[in-house]
Amino acid sequence: MKLALLILLLLNPHLSSSKNTPASGQPQEDLVEQKCLLKNYTHHSCDKVFCQPWQKCIEGTCACKLPYQCPKAGTPVCATNGRGYPTYCHLKSFECLHPEIKFSNNGTCTAEEKFNVSLIYGSTDTEGIVQVKLVDQDEKMFICKNSWSTVEANVACFDLGFPLGVRDIQGRFNIPVNHKINSTECLHVRCQGVETSLAECTFTKKSSKAPHGLAGVVCYTQDADFPTSQSFQCVNGKRIPQEKACDGVNDCGDQSDELCCKGCRGQAFLCKSGVCIPNQRKCNGEVDCITGEDESGCEEDKKNKIHKGLARSDQGGETEIETEETEMLTPDMDTERKRIKSLLPKLSCGVKRNTHIRRKRVVGGKPAEMGDYPWQVAIKDGDRITCGGIYIGGCWILTAAHCVRPSRYRNYQVWTSLLDWLKPNSQLAVQGVSRVVVHEKYNGATYQNDIALVEMKKHPGKKECELINSVPACVPWSPYLFQPNDRCIISGWGREKDNQKVYSLRWGEVDLIGNCSRFYPGRYYEKEMQCAGTSDGSIDACKGDSGGPLVCKDVNNVTYVWGIVSWGENCGKPEFPGVYTRVASYFDWISYYVGRPLVSQYNV
């Protein structure tokens, strides 16, 4: 029966989406990955999320860019301090550094025109029905309840000076009986959740005159009373009901309730990186998962939506496509944010055109063809090729620290586009070496920090290295881009398990393995090392493969150098998987030497 169910799931993967919903009787907290929570991830953690266009990733945290680092193209905007800025990005960058200054409106500033949000009919200043005064409107207006969600409520509370966001969007407010409110004249609002002011959200007015109900909010304060045993502790100190964690909604206000998930509640979408996002963000034209799968296979999804006449609702479900006439009252600043994002520099990479620890060694692999692994290089020391390496762009090669010594850099050559030692091909290029950088904390006894950089010499009169037939592999910035059981590829000229020499470049597929302490107790360091192999040991790296690549492809077939062949024992034995240097742990170290623009993508 279990086998039949497994076959059914494999034939119809859509059935497996039910994993996002907790099974009956399953404890709600089981959806939260406790080990991940210890890292205190928030919406500013670039291991889990993309930074905004006015931010950059520094040591795992989205930090403020300086305004001059923003793209120059754009329309002027006005801030709450009455000062104009050349673009939305310039203002958001300034706000990032000075949070008290917020967006007011598009265009130039005028003394009398200011956006305003307020609450009325509440018992305290933390709650009430929401009113807004748009810049070009004469009167304050209410917001329609049917366009109001936790997303918009969070932004309203941020705007009102409550940094922990919303506590509830339901409330009993004290509307005097003699106050007649016309709920047919309310405004509709749509936010994305990245805004800090409601002024950045899009306001519209519908032609319908039916009553809508009015949006209200109760903002969160530190004295909110949530039972500790039945609540989720957000990184910012806020507490929310446990059942609201991993539901695709940013209830914490800092997104910490959605970044450490093993599954998602309701219709939320689970990224491979353990992040839950609202279902309506799937196939919306913008990548939200750092692993990219929310924008994969979207053509079929769009066809189905059009065929069914459905659109995504604010709550992540589906609703009929609206035909009601809508008047847009404010510019769509989210479209402007996406436009700014599109202007950021693009990176082209990853797409083809002796002790008891033995230095590692591809066993059981297949011969490679020209162009299969254009990032693979060989490092020649004197008259013999001793190690592999990975081209990562510019003049830089990534390899293992145990392969090279800084003092011997003049002895090394980098061979690119090499397929066979014995039959040099016409595409083969030989580069001299100008510098070797070994990680300062490399430990030759334990193989910790077994990583090094080799800088190739530039040809006379050239500003850059020109490797015509080479393509750089992308450098991963997050440890969550790939997961245990993902299938990846190793390549090299290492010996076979019978110690027979190999002269042609060979490759093989291996699976990433989780914590390998059970195979190498006391010698495996999870943060710095990655295990990979096959269940029968038929594919492995072997002596001579050291320094070479363990590469993995994402859903868009972009190749990342996930590991560097480092060490292991007993070539080709299933109980002794290969151990690789985990490259994602060294992104900042690599970028320090090679320059961030060479390896940075997605605004990292």
Curated annotation (Swiss-Prot):
The EC code for this enzyme is 3.4.21.45
| Chain sites annotated for binding Ca(2+) 2 | 284, 286, 288, 294-295
GO MF assignments? metal ion binding; serine-type endopeptidase activity
Q: List the disulfide bonds.
A: 36-260, 46-57, 51-62, 64-96, 70-89, 78-109, 144-186, 157-219, 191-201, 234-252, 246-261, 264-276, 271-289, 283-298, 349-474, 387-403, 395-465, 488-552, 516-531, 542-571
Tissue specificity here reads:
Expressed in the liver by hepatocytes. Also present in other cells such as monocytes, fibroblasts or keratinocytes.
Glycosylation (residues): 40, 106, 116, 182, 515, 557
This chain belongs to which protein, by name?
A: Complement factor I
User: Taxonomic lineage of this organism?
Assistant: Eukaryota, Metazoa, Chordata, Craniata, Vertebrata
